[in-house]
């Protein structure tokens, strides 16, 4: 039996799509030295090669892919988006604005200098910034503003071509910039990170291990009573001295949960809860008492829950003010915008931050009720809210502004982005509304992006060889400039205008570029995870600004809007 693969793929768009995705994802796992190609560039390269062989795909799939992707970007940004505008995130907002605005202006200037059309220029901006949101915003605005223009198809092909030619240039140059730029400035990055760690009481260890608290019980002996010196538990401050707290006391056969006024007596049996290393460091006064193995005394349900910060008594408060340990709970992680933050007593909590907390189930529930809510342990997505806000985003995208002489519409990209932000924001405030498991959100976002990249590559592949010969050299030069010059401008602005700590500044710069591989290099250079504070500060707003930059570059290009 003979199978004509070419005819099979040509006649079956779904099969073609998944063949492109499978081959592209395999290619994306390859590494060039320490740099992994990544799924996006893998799918794009495969689709470009097949596009050269005149394979094509239904554009509806491409449109659906970009819509799903940009909507999910908004949902992820929503919980922390508005706090950036209203509080101490102004520096991060300004850095993200400087990064995006400078890249946009430089791209426009180079496009005019090399006499490119808007497709090549916008594609070059998206690739140099390694930003799919720019590509999505530009592509959608092109379709909205030039629907009746016979050049639309060519401009869309050029958009894909510009992105494909400059993506690797942007990624590699930024990684090298992240490696060497910190060495060119006079402040040592590890020293800057240690300075922040000292000032804020951060854990500067990038390999911090997280253990579940354990329970051990002891019979109180004379040494421990002498050590307590008649003070009650509140006055002793057991946790601050030992890292453990007394959860239960058995006295004269009666088991009770002690309050702060309790005073230890010889013969008491106490249940201590703490991390293993805290138990190991206990004062000999505790260990000199005989360890007790009592089922009732040790029968506690230690749980670990993710608590979403929501309530006013925690939002805009420092972590130290929440006083988790006073409520018998242990903090394992602080997560913001899916980025793990250093444990910092002075970090200001934002609405939507996630605190991973361990402790007795009752105590954890009490803390969750006080500061927010426990994240839902469910794999069920609120599809009704997802679909409703998706429809709202499409409706917003239909809005058109009419001015004398020209008009322009908001477009699907901006509309869906805004609707996604609102869904994410509402989800952070209402625990039972709009729940989307993070795994499901990641899957939809990644799948939408891959479908979009496959469609982009297949449509642009036919003209790639001709375009590469005409503008290939210019694209490489322009890609380097747009990738690196805004980074330098952002560094100068942050260092000498905002006077930011260098570790935070370089983290914020990588967040403004939304580049996780470069962020890893900055963490290694600082021998700390302190830069994650800066990365989280700019990442969410940068994704939104980059999408708007893709829209704006089309609108301001002469002759497009009219």
From Swiss-Prot:
GO molecular function: monoatomic cation transmembrane transporter activity
Keywords of this entry: Cell membrane, Membrane, Repeat, Transmembrane, Transmembrane helix, Transport
NCBIfam families noted in UniProt: PRK04972.1 (NF003440), YidE_YbjL_dupl (TIGR01625)
Sequence intervals crossing the membrane: 8-28, 32-52, 66-86, 94-114, 118-138, 158-178, 383-403, 406-426, 443-463, 477-497, 541-561
Membrane topology: Multi-pass membrane protein
Domain of life: Bacteria
Compartments, as annotated in UniProt: Cell membrane
Protein name, as recorded: Putative transport protein NT01EI_2530
InterPro entries for the chain: AAE_transporter (IPR050144), RCK_C (IPR006037), RCK_C_sf (IPR036721), Transp_YbjL_put (IPR023017), YidE_YbjL (IPR006512)
One CC-aspect GO term: plasma membrane
Gene Ontology BP annotations: potassium ion transport
Protein family: Belongs to the AAE transporter (TC 2.A.81) family. YbjL subfamily.
Organism taxonomic ancestry: Bacteria, Pseudomonadati, Pseudomonadota, Gammaproteobacteria, Enterobacterales
Location of the RCK C-terminal domain: 202-288, 290-373
């Amino acid at each position: 039996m003979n199978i004509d693969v070419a005819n099979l793929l040509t006649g079956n768009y779904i099969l073609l799509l998944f063949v492109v995705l499978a081959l592209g994802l395999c290619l994306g796992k390859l590494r060039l030295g320490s740099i992994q190609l990544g799924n996006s560039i893998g799918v794009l390269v495969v689709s470009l090669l097949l596009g050269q062989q005149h394979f094509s795909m239904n554009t509806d799939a491409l449109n659906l892919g970009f819509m799903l992707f940009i909507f999910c970007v908004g949902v992820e940004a929503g919980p922390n988006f508005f706090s950036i505008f209203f509080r101490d995130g102004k520096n991060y907002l300004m850095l993200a604005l400087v990064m995006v605005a400078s890249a946009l202006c430089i791209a426009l200037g180079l496009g005019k200098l090399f006499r490119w059309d808007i497709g090549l220029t916008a594609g070059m901006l998206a690739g140099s910034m390694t930003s799919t949101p720019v590509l999505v915003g530009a592509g959608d605005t092109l379709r909205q503003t030039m629907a009746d223009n016979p050049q639309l198809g060519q401009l869309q092909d050029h958009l894909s071509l510009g992105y494909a030619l400059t993506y690797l240039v942007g990624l590699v140059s930024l990684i090298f910039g992240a490696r060497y730029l910190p060495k060119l400035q006079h402040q040592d990055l590890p020293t800057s990170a240690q300075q922040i760690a000292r000032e804020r009481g951060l854990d500067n260890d990038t390999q911090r291990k997280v253990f579940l608290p354990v329970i051990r019980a002891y019979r109180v002996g004379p040494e421990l009573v002498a050590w307590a010196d008649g003070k009650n538990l509140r006055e002793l401050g057991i946790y601050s001295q030992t890292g453990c707290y007394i959860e239960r006391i058995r006295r004269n056969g009666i088991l009770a949960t002690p309050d702060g006024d309790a005073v230890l007596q010889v013969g008491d049996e106490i249940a201590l809860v703490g991390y293993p290393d805290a138990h190991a460091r206990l004062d000999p006064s505790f260990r000199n008492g005989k360890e007790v193995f009592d089922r009732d005394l040790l029968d506690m349900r230690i749980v670990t829950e993710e608590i979403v910060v929501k309530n006013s008594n925690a939002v805009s408060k420092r972590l130290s003010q929440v006083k988790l340990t006073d409520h018998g709970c242990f903090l394992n992680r602080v997560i913001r915008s899916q980025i793990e933050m250093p444990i910092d007593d002075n970090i200001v909590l934002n609405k939507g931050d996630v605190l991973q907390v361990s402790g007795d189930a009752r105590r954890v529930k009490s803390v969750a009720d006080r500061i927010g809510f426990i994240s839902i342990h469910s794999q069920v997505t609120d599809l009704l809210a997802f679909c409703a806000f998706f429809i709202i985003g499409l409706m917003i995208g239909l809005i058109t502004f009419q001015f004398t002489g020209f008009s322009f519409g908001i477009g699907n990209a901006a509309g869906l982005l805004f609707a996604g932000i609102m869904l994410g924001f509402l989800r952070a405030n209402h625990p039972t509304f709009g729940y989307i498991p993070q795994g499901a959100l990641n899957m939809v976002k990644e799948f939408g992006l891959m479908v979009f990249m496959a469609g982009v590559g297949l449509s642009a592949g036919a003209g790639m060889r001709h375009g590469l010969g005409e503008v290939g050299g210019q694209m490489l030069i322009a890609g380097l400039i747009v990738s690196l010059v805004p980074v330098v401008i952002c560094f100068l602005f942050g260092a000498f205008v905002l006077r930011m700590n260098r570790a935070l500044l370089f983290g914020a710069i990588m967040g403004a570029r939304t580049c996780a591989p470069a962020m890893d290099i900055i963490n290694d250079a600082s021998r700390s995870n302190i830069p994650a504070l800066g990365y989280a500060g700019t990442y969410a707003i940068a994704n939104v600004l980059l999408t708007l930059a893709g829209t704006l570059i089309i609108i301001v290009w002469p002759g497009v809007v009219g």
